[in-house]
Amino acid sequence: MKKMKIFLLLCLMFLISVNLAANDYEFRSQGGHIVPMNVSDIVIKSEKIHFKMESVKADYGMAEGMTVTVKFVFDSPEAGERYIGFITPESAQEEWLSDPENREEANEDYNFRNFKTSVNGKNVSMKTYKLTDFLPKDIKQLEEIKKYFKEYDKAKAKADADYYRKSYVYFFKANFKKGENVVEHSYHYGGIVGSISNDFNYVWTTISKWKNQKVDDFEVIVEPGNAFIEIPEIKMKNGKRVDWELIGEGNIDYGYKKYDGDNVKSRVLYAKLKKGYLRFKTKDFSPKDEFRLREIRNLNLEDYFPEKTEKGFRYTDDLMQAAYNARLLKEDELKKISDADLNIMKNYPYALKGYDFSDKKLKDYFSKFLWYVPIGKNVELYENDYEVIKDVEKIIKSRKK
């Protein structure tokens, strides 16, 4: 059974459900910005978010996903203890782990790991309560908890295909001093993992729950490593959009894509880097749209790509589809493929891994694709890559007989 790593928690961050009848896939795949659990009189002076795609060590091997590091500078008008946290729905892993076949993995945590938090340089721990369980009096009195129970509609929630019975509250107590307070936290999470793509969604419109409803000085960094990624355009409440800056080397460009349920095409950033990261900095950040990032794992299986980017880069072509379906090609289809085409088809797995071709024709051909960023001769292929090469080589050998 396929393991589902559900990106729910984004440690010390928050997803408040104001509409439990919302699209369940989107709902359960989002984390978000930490918020005050009671009405806040605190201002966010600065915030820096760093998303880094990487694998980390886990009990069962290496866990793919993204490491998140966030640094806040808050301005508090007075000293005192504050409750800060988030509410998130039950993970789909609970139902998955109820299957006897999967109980041996019941102690695994697929939501997040390597969690660290500090307030003004001192480490703090996170408290967790399931909202179907008994809640301490001080927790039940928090405004966000009362709001959750007031808005929870069991009948509407039960109508969803994947019904979450209730949620969890995660929070920490911060002893703030008057004036500036620094909160730092980091963690690793797995996102929603699939054979075609991994999705990492992040709710940050909840910035509006803080007193100033914005971040005075904001910066976000996305470090994708060698992943091919897409990030839908993000608009801010002032009408401006997030314009990503490439710090490093690689290919980035925009295309237009229609997502499921949308009537119009969205402007989407595509990026494949050799080194470096994407960055956005601004003053008075107040987002209208949420952050969404998709790691594209299988180009030949992706359901939709724009034909070209704004700069003219391509994403895929007929020869790629032929290469990954070589064993299914019919005789009349094979006749249309030249020997030169077969050589290109055979080298697609190498190109996708960033192989730096010495053959100028091959290098020129693959350079038209945004995802082709040569990194060297030593690239790692997997079993399915060798299967593609093997299938094409069979066709080449048959022509020599």
Residue ranges of predicted features:
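Amphipathic alpha-helical packing elements
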Residues: 333-372
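Long, non-globular segments of proteins
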Residues: 244, 315-318, 358
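Compact alpha-helical subdomains of small soluble proteins
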Residues: 357, 365-401
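Bacterial N-terminal signal peptides
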Residues: 9-17
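Short, charge-rich amphipathic alpha-helices with coiled-coil/heptad character
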Residues: 311-325
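A short, flexible low-complexity segment enriched in Lys/Arg and Gly/Pro that occurs
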Residues: 321-337
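Lumenal/extracellular ectodomains and adaptor appendage modules
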Residues: 22-312
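Bacterial N-terminal signal peptides that target proteins for export
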Residues: 1-8
